Amino acid sequence: MANRNDSRRDSRKDRKKDDIEDQLVAINRITKVVKGGRRMRFAAVVIVGDRKGHVGFGTGKAQEVPEAIRKAVEAGKKRMIKVPTVGTTIPHEVMGHYGSGNIMLKPAEAGSGVAAGGAVRIIMDLAGISDVTSKSLGSNTPINVIRATMDGLSKLKTREDVLKLRESAKSLED
């Protein structure tokens, strides 16, 4: 016989929170040397996004790989940013910096696809950007590339944002 709470449980299970997807970028084994030997842990880097202009990344460390991934996903959901888009691309060219890693992101014509490699491609895919060109300059470790890309995406402004800034600057001059 069915329990009265079964239907509620099923609906909660089927409904994902805002349809947020995650993709694993890297897993690193971390070793700490202690008096008794070596302590092994795992670090995971995950990118999360909803393919509708929201994307984030997170890192997690734990004794087991699945737990590290879970922690990284939770951290990524807390760190999501809104990415402005124009159709299927970004509004303008932008440079992202983090440490010695630099990422140049350029808008591309519709239908040209994502010309990017590794972590940048995953970020663009989960952000819902399907036409963009990128170039990685300097450090190319996955975490530096991710942080530089997120820095670049956070610098993007829409045409309306720029017009508001110009109007406010003009009113300050008067």
UniProtKB/Swiss-Prot annotation:
It comes from the Bacteria. One of its GO terms (cellular component) is small ribosomal subunit. One of its GO terms (molecular function) is structural constituent of ribosome. Keywords: Ribonucleoprotein, Ribosomal protein, RNA-binding, rRNA-binding. InterPro entries: Ribosomal_Su5_D2-typ_SF, Ribosomal_uS5, Ribosomal_uS5_bac-type, Ribosomal_uS5_C, Ribosomal_uS5_N, Ribosomal_uS5_N_CS, Ribsml_uS5_D2-typ_fold_subgr. Gene3D superfamilies: 3.30.160.20, 3.30.230.10. Pfam families: Ribosomal_S5, Ribosomal_S5_C. One of its GO terms (biological process) is translation. Residues 20-83 form the S5 DRBM domain. Part of the 30S ribosomal subunit. Contacts proteins S4 and S8. The N-terminal domain interacts with the head of the 30S subunit; the C-terminal domain interacts with the body and contacts protein S4. The interaction surface between S4 and S5 is involved in control of translational fidelity. NCBIfam families: rpsE_bact (TIGR01021). Belongs to the universal ribosomal protein uS5 family. With S4 and S12 plays an important role in translational accuracy. PANTHER family: MITOCHONDRIAL RIBOSOMAL PROTEIN S5. This is Small ribosomal subunit protein uS5. It comes from Lactobacillus gasseri (strain ATCC 33323 / DSM 20243 / BCRC 14619 / CIP 102991 / JCM 1131 / KCTC 3163 / NCIMB 11718 / NCTC 13722 / AM63).
